[in-house]
A protein has these predicted regions:
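Surface-exposed beta-loop interaction hotspot
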Residues: 75-116, 197-220
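Charged, low-complexity intrinsically disordered regulatory segments in eukaryotic signaling
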Residues: 106-137
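A solvent-exposed interaction/effector surface
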Residues: 117-118, 125-129, 143-152, 180-203
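Ubiquitin-like/PB1-type beta-grasp interaction modules and other compact soluble beta-rich domains
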Residues: 195-232, 240, 256-258, 263
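A short, structured beta-strand/loop element
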Residues: 127-150, 244-255
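N-terminal accessory interaction module
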Residues: 6-90, 225-266
């Protein structure tokens, strides 16, 4: 008598068509949003990570860890995994409702020749190149950007400056994109954020503002600039420290041995 194959139930999420959750062949929590597959994979150290794949042809119950290649950060538990999947589903649903459309483009950009572009609205275009990309705003659109954040040429690269476009024209972006943009502008341009929105960012709300505070408070302290496990003194970490953590030619350095058990990164 043949044993019955394992059952891997798949559930559709009410209110969000096209979102399904299930279990992979090797026991991972998995999900499908449109053509994007998600899984919560366990690493050797026991931590769990969100991994992704695109257009898997197999049924969800036949997926395995080897099918996934994208890495999207650590997740604490299955609840956090499901929350991230639903956030992505909301993002994709909202994006379909926007009037973005793809066009062929060979425009010259600061990052090389455009290999394609997405038009968000008249005068707001995102270009992709071989190595980078970003937004180009028309002169009229660019005048709407706050002077503290405005790029003279109307180009805004995709790593951080894209967020300037998003907070200037929020109606062209999804809720997820707007949240990411808010975080990016606070972290990178806190002075502009405070001026535009009439608020004061508190400790922990801006990487850049926190960095400045740290440098002021520790300007006269020896701050670790680099560290390696010592090859000469087992059980110790060799650290290089500079005043205020400054770097560059001519900066005075001091070297210390710190017991490995007492050294922590942070």
């Amino acid at each position: 008598m043949n044993a019955s194959p394992p059952v891997h139930p798949q559930t559709e999420t009410p209110g969000l068509p096209g979102v399904s959750f299930g279990t992979s062949a090797d026991g991972m929590p998995v999900a499908l949003v449109g053509d994007t597959a998600f899984a919560m994979a366990k690493a050797r150290d026991g931590r769990r990570y969100l991994v992704t794949a695109w257009r898997l042809s197999k049924p969800m119950g036949e997926w395995t860890r080897d099918d996934f290649y994208g890495h999207s950060g650590e997740r604490a538990d299955e609840a956090a995994f499901r929350a991230r999947v639903l956030e992505n589903a909301e993002h994709q649903h909202e994006k379909r409702a926007l009037s973005r459309h793809e066009i062929c483009s060979r425009a010259s950009t600061p990052w090389g020749a455009s290999q394609g572009a997405t038009v968000y609205a008249e005068g707001v275009t995102s270009h992709s190149t071989a190595g980078h990309g970003g937004f180009k705003l028309s002169a009229e659109r660019n005048r709407k950007v706050h002077p503290m954040l405005r790029s003279a040429g109307g180009w805004y690269e995709e790593d951080a400056a894209w967020a300037i476009v998003a907070i200037t024209f929020p109606h062209l972006f999804t809720a997820f994109e707007r949240r990411c943009a808010e975080r990016t502008v606070k972290d990178s341009w806190p002075d502009a954020w405070e001026a535009i929105f009439g608020t004061i960012l508190q400790p922990g709300e801006s990487h850049e503002k926190d960095r400045r505070s740290f440098e002021r408070e520790h300007a006269d302290h020896w701050v670790v600039a680099s560290a390696i496990t010592s090859k000469h003194e087992p059980g110790f970490v060799e650290v290089v420290a500079t005043l205020g953590g400054k770097r560059g030619a001519g900066t005075e350095e001091r070297r210390f041995l710190v017991p490995s058990g007492e050294y922590s990164i942070g």
